[in-house]
Amino acid sequence: MSQKSVCVTYLLWLFFGLFGIHRFYLNRPCSGVLYLFTCGCFFIGWFIDICLIPGMVEDYNAKYDSMNKTTTTVTQVVVQPVYQGSPQQQPYGAPPQQPYGAPPQQPYGAPPQQPYGAPPQQPYGAPPPQPYGAPPPGAYAPQGNYPPPYGPQ
């Protein structure tokens, strides 16, 4: 099915209108059968159709357009804004999140960790750190009244 033309309808009316062919063309089968058996309602209906054809074609095309229109669905997505500084909602069952700037807490039952991670790295070529009380390599020997060292001298 497609839209119908007024010119084609007038041509069908002129040559075959007494048999109602123009009515069948415009999907009006009941009046087409009536015209077929009465010779266009005794020529009177055939003559009146000269004025009715433009309206019949317009009605047919309007029905055709309304049946073949595509429907467009518009979907709107609403997003909840997240403001800086406000806590975000955690999913169900997730542990609570620490506020920014607070030191992380240990999970329940976990061994304690260093508060700030690994010790800082020494620069390349620097001697390794010594335990407390031991003089660094190359330092002067202590002087003064210290107890004598153990063992032979």
UniProtKB/Swiss-Prot annotation:
Entry keyword set: Membrane, Repeat, Transmembrane, Transmembrane helix
Record region (Disordered): 85-153
Organism per entry: Dictyostelium discoideum
GO cellular component: membrane
Domain TM2: 3-50
Keyword Metal-binding: no
Protein name in the entry: TM2 domain-containing protein DDB_G0277895
UniProt region (6 X 8 AA tandem repeat of Q-Q-P-Y-G-A-P-P), positions on chain: 89-136
Lineage: Eukaryota, Amoebozoa, Evosea, Eumycetozoa, Dictyostelia
PANTHER family: BETA-AMYLOID BINDING PROTEIN-RELATED, TM2 DOMAIN-CONTAINING PROTEIN DDB_G0277895-RELATED
InterPro entries associated with the record: TM2, TM2D1-3-like
One Pfam assignment: TM2
